[in-house]
Each structure stands twice: as structure tokens, then as C-alpha cells.
Amino acid sequence: MTNGDSSSSALTDNERAVLDDIEAQGIDFLRLQFTDILGTVKNVSIPAHQAEKAFTEGIYFDGSSIEGFVRIQESDMRLDPDPETFAVLPWRSNGDGGSARLICDVVDREGNAFAGGPRQVLKNVLARADDMGYSVSIGPEPEFFLFEKDDDGNATTTAHDQGGYFDLAPKDLASDIRREIIFTLEAMGFEIEASHHEVARGQHEINFKYDDALTTADNIATFRAVVRAVAEQHDVHATFMPKPIGEINGSGMHSHISLFDEDGENVFADNDDEFNLSETAYQFMGGVLEHAPAFTAVTNPTVNSYKRLVPGYEAPVYIAWSGVNRSALIRVPDAAGVSARFEIRSPDPSCNPYLALAAVIAAGLDGIDTDADPGDAVREDIYEFDEDKRDAYGIDTLPGHLGDAVTALESDPVMQDALGEHVCEKFAEAKRHEYAEYKASVSEWETDRYLEKF
């Protein structure tokens, strides 16, 4: 695969290892992947023999054609593959050859990191954490639905099964699909911890092990692609839409967060505390609670996201924290020592994982900087509080719709700084357009309720 010329001498050890893997595993094509500002995975496919050129020169593309990137007069951009993200795509491999993927960073024509690249936004926030002496560990729990297709192959909202929480077959018809998803993920380097049927009919969860924040964001994007690909092979449709069916639980992406110092010690841990959390953990938590209204536009980025964030369906609405109370935005699991952490429960799996993690981490780091106070734990079901009781506890609510969430994002200097001017401007523009389209639409609920009444 290498040819001994000056370009090959510029390869890193990791890049050389990828070239060796490509040859050893009979890879014919490489998918070079990145995400647009909304989190949609984009890719360009190249013959495997172009891999060395991709590493040494990059692959050019038209940035003006990508949502949230650049204007046409600034359109020349380049993909730089990250060799540590190399993975064979099991569903694209056979005896005649196979395909693999590399996740890429985006640079401009001068070779500078593109400030509007979501992966770069997360890298910038993690660099700030590193300057403060921390690495960030994230463990996500993405949920998804499996739906039947109609005779024309289009997705429906007919659940693939009628199972419930932790059900077994025959109610859980998707156990074999989850099993194949797990095998595929493991073949791509994931460490799977558990899988099960979720509360709602047709709803599922597969948990993979926590990792550093950048790897976790890459893994979330990969996870969504794998779930969809395996579902297609079984002629069902997988969706990460937060609330595809009313009156049942929606899909979230609860995320467990902890910080580690340069010696690998969990700085969130304090075994003398009631919740096994340190002062640093409470400061970080305080920052997350303070900036939650602003980052909600990023962690819950669709009109549909706010159909999930309503009382009564195990999704958070109120900005508070608790030990075991799932009505709060933040829950502290019963864990100590190296496992000390807290869980933020609002994100949903439709988010751009790079921007969502960047926003939450930036909020927490600001809390450490400002010695933010999260207040006392709420030990009661907040869903049962009336407005006066919530006011007495000082409990605010998350934005009720996408429009309010975008306004909060645009009003928060910490989020503006973390995401960068380019991303904030382009993201807000796209989301305001989406919300305006939604407000102008007429739903089936409205026609069912009013068409014959008036």
C-alpha cells in the first residue's frame, strides 16, 4: 500500500497502521465521514488505494453545499481523516471485498481547522478542559424505535412489537435485531454493556461503555448508522425521532458525565458526601443547571423534541437535581469512587452529538470557573409540585418549544463562546426557519378537533 516516496514518509504510525489494515482485510472502498451542523452524517467514498493520498493531502469538497458551513465564494474545503476512527463496516463487507470508514476533521484551503465543523467545536471545548487539568468521560444511553414499513417500503408508526420494559420474546420481537446490532457494534470496536426493550412499544435501548467525550461523540454517530443499517436488513425502520407517537414515552439519550485529572483520578468522587460527589462535581453540576435553558436548543434540536419534554413520561421538564428522582434534569446514580458521576436526562438522540456534548461540557466548566451552586437536591416528584411550590424551591423549567430554546441560546454568552460565532449563527438560523415552518403548518390534531366543530 505504501510506496516509499516522500508522501509516505510523512505518514504517522497510526496512518501506516490503517494502510496495513486496509490491505490485510481486503478493503476496496473507504467512506470518509463527517457531520453537518445539524448532525447529519455526510460521506464521500474513495477507492482504498487512495487512502494514502487522503492522509497526506486530504480530500477536497464543496463546503457551500453542506448545511451550516460556508458561502459559495469560500467553498473549497478539505477532509482530513482521523486514523484512530478506522473501522470496517460489517454490513458492507463480503468475500469479494469490503468497505471501511474514517471519521474526518474539516479544514479550510489553507489547512486551518474549520471553526464551523462540529467535531472541531467539541475539540475546542475539550482543549479548554485539558487546560484546566481535566479529561471528560461520557456514557450515553441512546434510545430508538423500530417501526414496520408499508407495502411500498415507506416507514409507518406501527410499532414492530408490543413489548414493554425488559420484556422477553414473544412480546419482544426485536431481540434478534438488537443481537445483530450488538454483534455489528462489537465488530467495530464498541464495548456493549447491556440491551433491553424499553417502556414504550417498539422502543429499545443499547448501552455502550463510557469513553472520552470525542470518542463518545464519534460512537453516537456510528451507533445511529449501525442501528439504521441493521434494521433495514430486517425490513423495519429504525428512528431516533424523540417522540414519534403521542401518549407514550419518547426516546432520550441520558448521558452520564464525570471528570478525571491528569493522574486518572475521578475528580467528581468524594466518598464522605451523601451523594459521593465532590465540590468540583457540584460546581460542574451548577453550571449545567445554570446554562440548561440555553443548551437545550442543541441537546433537543427539533420541533418534535419538545413533545418529549412534557410531564408524566419520565422526561425532564424542571431544572433541578436529585439522587434518584427521575423528574429532575440531573440524577445522581448510587455510585462511588472511580464510578462517581451524574446523569443529565434531557438530551435526545436527534441531536448533533459533537455540539450537544460541547455545550453541556462548556456549561459545566463555566460552573467550575464561577463556583456555581446547584442548590439542594429535590427529593420529591417535581411533577406533583404546583407553581407556588416550584417557586419556593427555586425550580425553573426548560424551554417549552424550539423557538424559546433558540432565543435562550442566542442570549447566553457562555454558549456563544463555546460553540463559536459561526456555529451559533448558522444553527440558530436553521432552527428558526424550522420553527417558522412548524408554526405555519396545520396538524391532523387540529383538523380532527376543529374541522367539524366550527
Swiss-Prot record:
Main localization, broad class: cytoplasm
Regulation: Inhibited by glutamine.
Residues binding L-glutamate: N249, G250, R308, E314, R326, R345
Free-text comment on the cofactor: Binds 2 Mg(2+) ions per subunit.
Gene3D superfamilies: Glutamine synthetase, N-terminal domain, Glutamine synthetase/guanido kinase, catalytic domain
Enzyme class: ligase
EC number, as in UniProt: 6.3.1.2
Function, in words: Glutamine synthetase (GS) is an unusual multitasking protein that functions as an enzyme, a transcription coregulator, and a chaperone in ammonium assimilation and in the regulation of genes involved in nitrogen metabolism. It catalyzes the ATP-dependent biosynthesis of glutamine from glutamate and ammonia. Feedback-inhibited GlnA also interacts with and regulates the activity of the transcriptional regulator TnrA. During nitrogen limitation, TnrA is in its DNA-binding active state and turns on the transcription of genes required for nitrogen assimilation.
Stated name of the protein: Glutamine synthetase
Organism whose genome encodes this protein: Halobacterium salinarum (strain ATCC 700922 / JCM 11081 / NRC-1) (Halobacterium halobium)
Lineage of the species this protein comes from: Archaea, Methanobacteriati, Methanobacteriota, Stenosarchaea group, Halobacteria
Gene: glnA
